[in-house]
Regions:
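Receiver (REC) domain active-site loop signature in two-component systems and cognate sites
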Residues: 54
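Conserved phosphotransfer cores of two-component systems
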Residues: 41-43, 67-74, 95
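Two-component/phosphorelay signaling modules centered on CheY-like receiver
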Residues: 10-28
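The C-terminal output helix
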Residues: 115-131
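C-terminal output helix
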Residues: 87, 105-114
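Active-site beta3 strand of CheY-like receiver
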Residues: 43-49
Length: 131
């Protein structure tokens, strides 16, 4: 899968990017929602993983932009955050996000989620080809 990862924490961004590449994915990195928006003007992706709280264009506003103004409106979207508190969960719920994973969750959690999303995308592609 081609995955866009968006996070203002450069260290996390680099580690996540390398991790996903090791698992066979093509990865595009962006340091905030504004940069990610520019990426989507040029690239089609299969999955977006975005931090919730970032400068310039936060995850919630970036998610809204993706859903309303891009060809990526139906692309699965995972919010990630180092915060796992009530405020963060409210932002996630209010954003009508597909998935949320805490940055403190075991790496296997995100791997399983990405694998499940990839499997669902493959099944949809097969179903579309049949019709």
């Amino acid at each position: 899968m081609k995955i866009l990862v968006v996070d203002d924490n450069k260290g996390f961004l680099d580690v996540m990017g390398e991790f996903l590449k090791e698992h066979g994915h093509k990865v595009i990195l962006a340091e905030d929602g504004k940069q990610a928006r520019e990426v989507l003007e040029e690239e089609k992706v299969d999955l977006i993983i975005s931090d919730v709280f970032m400068p310039n264009l936060d995850g919630s506003r970036f998610h809204s932009y993706v859903r309303e103004f891009t060809d990526s409106a139906t692309v699965p979207f995972i919010f990630i955050s180092g915060y796992d508190d009530e405020h963060t969960r409210k932002v996630v719920v209010d954003s009508d996000i597909d998935f949320f994973v805490s940055k403190t969750a075991p790496v296997e959690t995100i791997v399983k989620l990405i694998d499940r999303i990839g499997s669902n995308l493959s099944q949809k592609a097969v179903a579309t080809e049949r019709h």
